[in-house]
């Protein structure tokens, strides 16, 4: 088992050729928000990941093992609800209103210019449909917002 205890956000400082050569690991959001987990990379190696508590792993980040090997993180497709304005009489403002209501419920949400994504929840799906939004379930990568107090800079 390879022990991983370092993370390079978005592969910062690494040459593109190194990123291209690195093994990859696909992780869903449930795993990526944990600081300790096991996974298997694209080369079949078992990874024991031990990051500082509170660390969130994002697609595009690079995990660095104790032996110096690198593993590129990919956000694995998972079940998500994709929310879009009604094609007949909706507007982009409808997404703003939906994001407001979802935020009031502390729902993790991925914001895009033309859609929102959340993890499946039939109660929320019904609420959004009642707001005249289109809600469909699909398989896609999920990268929710970090929130107002998430680490990171401009």
Give the location of each predicted region.
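Helix-rich terminal scaffold detector
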Residues: 1-21, 31-34, 43, 117-154
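Aromatic-residue detector
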Residues: 53-56, 112, 121, 153
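Compact, glycine-rich, soluble single-domain proteins
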Residues: 23-26, 32-34, 38-101, 110
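Conserved, well-structured core segments that form or line functional sites
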Residues: 87-137, 141
């Amino acid at each position: 088992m390879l022990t991983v205890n370092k993370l390079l956000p978005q592969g910062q400082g690494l040459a593109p050729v190194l990123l291209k050569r690195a093994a990859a690991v696909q992780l869903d959001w449930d795993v990526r928000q944990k600081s300790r987990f096991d996974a298997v990379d694209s080369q079949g190696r078992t990874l024991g990941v031990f990051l500082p508590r509170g660390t969130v792993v994002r697609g595009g980040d690079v995990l660095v093992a104790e032996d110096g090997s690198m593993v590129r993180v990919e956000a694995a497709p998972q079940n998500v609800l994709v929310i879009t304005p009604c094609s007949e009489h909706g507007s982009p403002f409808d997404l703003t209103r939906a994001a407001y209501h979802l935020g009031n419920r502390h729902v993790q949400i991925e914001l895009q210019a033309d859609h929102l994504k959340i993890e499946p929840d039939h109660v929320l799906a019904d609420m959004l449909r009642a707001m005249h939004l289109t809600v469909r379930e699909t398989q896609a990568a999920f990268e929710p917002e970090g929130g107002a107090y998430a680490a990171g800079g401009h």
